[in-house]
Amino acid sequence: MSRWPLPEPMQSALDAARRGESAGEVPIGAVVVKDGVVIAAAHNAPRALHDPTAHAEMLVIRQAAAALGNERLDGCELWVTLEPCAMCAGAIAHARISRLYYAAPDPKGGAVEHGARVFDHDQCLHRPEVYSGMGEAAASALLRDFFRSRR
């Protein structure tokens, strides 16, 4: 248990993950914050949308871009409960997200600190500031309990 309360955006991302779990999706949630205000929230929805790209990060980036009327999300923060995969990390770079906060590492599928390490490549034209670990215990417990219940 953390000595400090989680920042509100990570609480919101965890809430989105719980909504996804209730819908039968893998419990991963994400929010986009602009000027201290959550402007978009989403959870994984590949099953519901019959879309393998419907990761929480992809959906929330689309929502935020629509809300701002701009495909560039300069000055925005993305808060997500799990380390983004290569696809999502690429979308984060293309959207020009300024800061990425993720709760739990993903040694198998993550592509920020693990695997492809997308932001470390010369071909990556934008690199957000990256912060990890806030909310790790809660996000990891959600995922662990979800998969345990399905085995």
Feature-to-residue mapping (PLM):
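Zinc-dependent deaminase
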Residues: 1-20, 84-151
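A short, polar/acidic, helix/strand-boundary loop motif
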Residues: 2, 46-47
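Small-residue (primarily alanine) positions within well-ordered alpha-helices
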Residues: 13, 17-20, 30, 40, ...
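Short, basic and Ser/Thr-rich N-terminal targeting/leader segments
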Residues: 24-28, 74
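Short beta-strand scaffold segments in enzyme catalytic cores
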Residues: 28-36
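Short beta->alpha transition motifs characteristic of CBS
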Residues: 39-46
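A short, polar/charged loop-to-alpha-helix boundary motif
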Residues: 48-58
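Immediate flanking context of iron-sulfur cluster ligation sites
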Residues: 70-82
